[in-house]
Amino acid sequence: MLGGIFSGWCGRRGRGRAYEPPDELRLRESLAVLNVILPAPLAAEDVMASAEAARRLARADTLARTYQACQRNLECLARHEASGDDGLDAVVAAHAANARRLADTCLAALMHLYLSVGAVDADTDDLVEQALRMTAESNVVMSDVAVLERTLGLARRRQPAPVRAAPAGLGLPVPAQPAPRATAARPAPPPPPEEAGEDEEGDRPEDDAAPLLPPRAPAKTRPPEKARRLAEACKM
């Protein structure tokens, strides 16, 4: 009781409210991890100047380490070659997509925190707290990542479907060609009349056959005077 009274008179704060600066080695290690991502490096003197800056540095350090871990996972997954196992390729593609989304979310939250340095912004603290809770869990739920993506304004990128490699000795399947459209056949134009007549005459068998009988001699005609006399004799 007396200790509390003396502390109030002397202006000392309680142990729970006292600020203990972090170790300088740990502080510089966090700065080294964070300055790799930030567009402008931070100095240790600027961070140690206030408790708020040190608190934000600790949060940014966690986000930066998670971002770098996701980048290493993406590098390892990028070395995977497509195999004949569809299940394995689908799992690798899903892990790569989730790691990319988590890395983008951490980087966006980190940039949001960096841009809000020097200003008291409750929304930024809420975003960073949510990102820290998400990355601290052993099993990251991608629905939480989707919420952060919508909050931070990140566009969802579609990953291409994994391409199954063709077995050795077999070529890729040839894509089916579209069937040609059926076109109505145009009727042939009729031949000219002269050519048609020639064709018909040439097709007759009697025109090509030679005559079997000799031609008849012309009949003899009597003179008109003899014919008249013969007619009068018949009348008598």
Curated annotation (Swiss-Prot):
Gene Ontology CC terms, in alphabetical order: host cell Golgi apparatus; viral tegument
Protein keywords: Host cytoplasm, Host Golgi apparatus, Lipoprotein, Palmitate, Phosphoprotein, Virion, Virion tegument
Annotated region (Disordered), positions in chain: 156-236
Biased composition range(s): Basic and acidic residues: 222-236
Disulfide bridges in this chain: none
Compositional bias of kind Low complexity: 160-186
Ranges of Acidic residues composition bias in the record: 195-209
Transmembrane segments: none
Protein localization: Virion tegument; Host cytoplasm; Host Golgi apparatus
Plastid found in the keyword field: no
Post-translational modifications: Phosphorylated. Palmitoylation is necessary for Golgi localization.
Domain of life: Viruses
Covalent lipid adducts (S-palmitoyl cysteine), residues: C10
InterPro entries per the UniProt record, alphabetical: Herpes_UL51
Main subcellular localisation: virion
Pfam families: Herpes_UL51
Role: Plays several roles during the time course of infection, including egress of virus particles from the perinuclear space and secondary envelopment of cytoplasmic capsids that bud into specific trans-Golgi network (TGN)-derived membranes.
Quaternary structure and partners: Oligomerizes. Interacts with UL7; this interaction mediates UL7 incorporation to virions.
Family: Belongs to the herpesviridae UL51 family.
Name used for this protein in its record: Tegument protein UL51
Protein's organism: Suid herpesvirus 1 (strain Kaplan) (SuHV-1)
